[in-house]
Each structure stands twice: as C-alpha cells, then as structure tokens.
Design a protein with these regions (language model features):
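Residues forming anionic-ligand binding surfaces in small-molecule and nucleic-acid pockets
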Residues: 104-112, 134, 225
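Charged structural interfaces that engage phosphate-rich ligands
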Residues: 35-38, 48, 133, 228-233
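Non-catalytic, polymerase-adjacent accessory regions of viral genome-replication enzymes
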Residues: 1-83
Length: 347
C-alpha cells in the first residue's frame, strides 16, 4: 500500500514536470510560506498546461472509469481533440454550474455503510485543476504533524511519530476524539473564511468552490437533495478541504505546547541519549513546571489523537477540544465513541 502511494506521487511529479507546471507550484509554495496572498489564481488554474495536467492525473485513477450522474467517463473526454477539450474546461470556469453528485454507499469493515459522492467527470477535472494550484499554497501553511491526504506523507509516518511520543516523550495518555459525521457536517461559511485566511483571495475561485459545496446530490433512490453543509467524501477536492478545516485545530493544539517549546526565550539545542530519548534542557524543564499542559496532536484526515502526560491533563484536554470544535467549527463530538486511553495499561 505504502509503495503504491509513493509510486503514484512520483508519477504525479513527473506529469507536473512534463507539463512545465512544477516551477509554478514551487513558486506558489514559496510565496505562501513567506506570507503572500493570492488574488489572481484563476489565470493559473485555467491555463492549458494545468488543464492538461489535470486530465493526465485523473486518467491515472481507477475512479475515472466510474460515471457520474451524466453517464460519462474519462473515455468520453479522451477522444476529444486536445484544444477542444481545453476550451471545454475553460468554459466551465467562466460560469461554473456543477452537475448533481451521485451518492453511492459502500460497506465499511464494521458492517455499516459509508456514503460517497461521485461528481461528473468534467466536474472532477475542474476540481483537479483547482487542487493542483491550491495544494502548494495550503501545504505551506499546514501543521507538520497532520499526515492524511498530503504529498509525501502516509499513515506509516503518523504511526511512527505517535510511537515516538509514547516511547521517547513518555506521553502515555491518549485522547481519542470522534467527530460525528465530519465530512457531512463541515460548515460552508466557516470553510470559505478559512480558505481566505490561508491567503487564497481570488473571489472567482471562492465562488466556484462555494458552488461545488452546494452541488445537488442525487440519492440512491433517485431523489435529488440540496445540502446546506458538508463536503462529500469522494470529491477530489474534499480531502484538501477537510485538512483546511482541521488545520485550525492542529495549530490551536500546537500553540498550547509545541510552539511554546519552539519559541522559548532561551531556546536550547536538543540532544539525545544513545537510546534516542531527548535530553531536556533547563528551559524545557521550566516549561514543564509551568501551568501549561504538555500535549501533542497527530492527525490523519478527521482521525486524530492527542497525547498527554497525565490522566488529569488528558481528561481536561478532551473537554477543551470538544468545546473548541463546537464553538469554532460547529462540529459535534461523540462521547460514546471518544475516550482517554492509558497506553501503559494492558487489557
């Protein structure tokens, strides 16, 4: 699985270089890192090279052969002359109206069903064009320990970091928070504000994303519904939008401890014992004795765990996070599925 993901990412990099877009993406990342804002992204998004790259990336996905509500697949676009195809997609950007998203349900390992939204193939191309340009801008602002659906990151990386927190940092109490129906409950207005805050300020692009979020959903029984919240799982842009929503949580948790360690008045160079454990300097020790709770977050999409030093800290953290998620993001936490676990305690 991991090797397949690496091969797929390398393939996308080769495609970007082939269509001469990689330098543009690198520049977007660097500008975002330095605090630039972006008011004219549609010129890049609708550029022929970016559209051709989007087609190439979509074509490599198994899902490209699955039809949306219009019955079309990637094959129907592949037979078009290249210049005609590019003009078709550019026309979508001028006045974008997404077609209905096809809702299907697939079984989960626990026997329940997971709803997936399948956009029409042209809408998938449009989303891919946007993803390619938004991703480097967002990557420059994302927290380093979120691992889901990000370039050059994997579940294995998340597990490795979590293992280190428990073994080297001795953070043995884990807060496991379950958000009720995360993808179905994303607040559209809040999400659009978060996109703006990340420096993406092209109003035309914001309007297109807003239209995507409000695309009608064709249910399995044939009924068409309009949703006022949520971003359907299955959409190409949905994983990035999910990371944008929860990036604010990542940095809020980090501000409680991680960033304090990083920006101490007298920071010290970390050194290590032969077994890999960190040697803590005096400044770090003083920070531990303060009223701040030591906590670290590890997140993979909407699945996240917060590592704490004591049971009391973990329980306080759970209620603080639950309160924060509701007040800031309008997301509810399931008390039944959430828990605090002592990793040293064997079943």
């Amino acid at each position: 699985m991991y090797m397949a993901q690496k091969a797929k990412k390398k393939s996308k990099l080769r495609h970007a270089e082939y269509y001469d877009m990689q330098k543009t993406f690198d520049s977007l990342y660097a500008d975002s890192k330095s605090g630039e804002v972006f008011g004219h992204l549609m010129d890049i998004i609708s550029a022929p090279s970016n559209i051709k790259l989007a087609f190439r990336n979509i074509k490599g996905n198994d899902g490209s052969h699955t039809a949306g509500t219009d019955g079309r697949t990637i094959e129907s676009l592949a037979v078009m002359p290249e210049d005609k195809f590019v003009k078709l997609i550019q026309k979508q950007f001028r006045r974008y109206e997404p077609k209905a998203v096809k809702r299907v349900e697939i079984p989960k390992p626990n026997g329940k069903m997971r709803p997936l939204g399948i956009p029409c193939i042209i809408d998938r191309i449009v989303q891919q064009c946007i993803l390619q340009v938004m991703e480097p801008i967002c990557e420059a602002k994302f927290y380093e320990h979120s691992y889901g659906f990000r370039p050059c990151r994997s579940a294995e990386n998340a597990i490795s970091y979590a293992y280190g927190l428990a073994q080297r940092n001795k953070l043995h109490y884990v807060v496991d928070v379950d958000v009720k129906g995360f993808f179905d409950n994303v607040d559209h207005r809040k999400l659009l504000k978060q996109i703006w805050t990340l420096g993406i300020r092209d109003t035309k692009l914001i309007q297109i994303i807003k239209a995507m979020l409000k695309a009608p959903i064709e249910m399995p029984d044939g009924e068409t519904v309009l949703l006022s919240k949520g971003t359907p799982q299955g959409g190409i842009l949905s994983p990035l939008l999910a990371n944008i929503v929860l990036n604010e949580l990542d940095w809020w948790i980090a501000s409680q401890w991680d960033e304090m360690v990083r920006h101490m008045k007298h920071p010290c160079k970390m050194t290590y014992y032969p077994n890999g454990a960190e040697k803590k300097c005096n400044s770090y020790t003083a920070l531990k004795k303060s009223n701040l709770k030591e906590m670290r977050i590890v997140r993979y999409a909407d699945d996240f765990k917060i590592f704490c030093r004591t049971k009391e800290d973990a329980e306080k953290t759970y209620y603080a996070v639950k309160d924060w998620l509701w007040k800031r993001l309008k997301l509810e936490v399931s008390d039944e599925k959430s828990k605090v676990t002592n990793l040293r305690k064997r079943d």
